[in-house]
A protein has these predicted regions:
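Nucleic acid-binding interface residues in structured DNA/RNA-binding domains
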Residues: 2-117
Length: 117
């Protein structure tokens, strides 16, 4: 995807961002991964903060509520929308009231099996 630099939209999606978005697309309804889980799943390189940056820029195109902090909380300011998705998908919760918290022990998704190549 290419975009002129002055159009005011997000920057073009690079390989790392594309990989993050692919992982998020693969998270099943009712399950979650933390920013760190995604970074670890993708292997050496960028960490949780870089995953967070990708989600901040491009996350609206994917099921962003399935990517949360390691303590089970959604991105700041998104509790009320995220909890509606969690309840609709049957995501295990520790608290449906602010501060919303997902039960990471039950809801964490390990990712798709990877080729041992």
């Amino acid at each position: 995807m290419t975009r002129p630099p002055d159009d005011g939209g997000p920057p073009p999606v690079d390989d790392f961002a594309s990989s993050v978005l692919d992982v998020v697309d693969s998270i099943p309804p009712g399950r979650v991964m933390s920013y760190g889980d995604i970074a670890e799943y993708l292997g050496a390189g960028p960490g949780p903060r870089q995953v967070g940056r990708v989600m901040a820029v491009y996350g609206g195109a994917v099921a962003w509520w399935r990517v949360i902090h390691a303590d089970g909380t959604p991105a700041p300011g998104h509790d009320s929308v995220a909890v509606r998705h969690y309840l609709a998908e049957g995501t295990p919760l520790r608290s449906a009231r602010p501060p919303v918290r997902v039960d990471m022990r039950r809801a964490r998704w390990p990712g798709l099996p990877r080729d041992p190549a």
